[in-house]
UniProtKB/Swiss-Prot annotation:
It comes from the Bacteria. This is Adenine phosphoribosyltransferase. The gene is apt. InterPro entries: Ade_phspho_trans (IPR005764), PRibTrfase_dom (IPR000836), PRTase-like (IPR029057), UPRTase/APRTase (IPR050054). GO terms for cellular component: cytoplasm. Keywords: Cytoplasm, Glycosyltransferase, Purine salvage, Transferase. Gene3D superfamilies: 3.40.50.2020.
Length: 189
């Protein structure tokens, strides 16, 4: 069942509109990428410019409310959201990539997956200590990637002002794993 987290502080008309848009533009793909998983596909959202604009606008509001000076997008779908948010704000954009995808010196963080580990990286000079960074991604599920991204940014002295996501899967422990980071989902499932 999909529902808006009515108790979320700071809900605005824009975030309520974004939740309504998301309900109509997220497709469930059964048993992908493995049996038993219901994948939340944002392709219908991306292929509908007006709907995508509403969602980006709500994410821009989240960034403004938190005084973000930099937007960090988590690979890969986080890039699709973070770039237009940074553009609308006139803010810096920091890509958080899978290991081995960035040229030059990097900082990395390794985190646990269900079966193994993964590593993400940022350029060593991507963020200055005085920057206020909003992390952006499509889904908060188990929280491993978001927690690692938060650690990377905090490790260079940036102030991470929150994690904005299209959807939070509330039946998974993502929020607990990224605590005390402020999580702002546009839609809670």
């Amino acid at each position: 069942m999909t529902s808006i987290d009515e108790a979320a502080p700071g809900r605005s008309a824009a975030s309520d509109a974004a939740a309504d848009v998301l309900r109509g533009h997220i497709r469930d793909i059964q048993d992908w990428p493995q049996p038993g998983v219901v994948f939340k596909d944002i392709t219908p959202l991306l292929s509908t410019p007006a709907a995508f604009g509403v969602v980006v606008g709500a994410l821009v509001d989240v960034a403004r409310e938190r005084g973000a000076t930099t937007i960090a997008g988590i690979e890969a779908r986080g890039f699709l959201l973070a770039a237009p948010v940074a553009d609308r704000l006139g803010a810096a954009l920091v890509p958080i990539r899978k290991q081995g995808k960035l040229p030059g010196p990097t900082r990395s963080a390794t985190y646990d997956l269900e079966y193994g580990t993964a590593t993400i990286e940022i350029h060593a000079d991507a963020v200055r200590p005085d920057e206020r960074v909003l992390l952006v991604d499509d889904v908060l599920a188990t929280g491993g990637t978001a927690a690692a991204a938060h650690g990377l940014l905090a490790g260079v002295g940036a102030e991470v002002v929150g994690l904005a996501v299209l959807m939070e899967l509330s039946f998974l422990p993502g929020r607990e794993r990224v605590a005390p980071l402020d999580v702002v989902p546009l839609l809670t499932i």
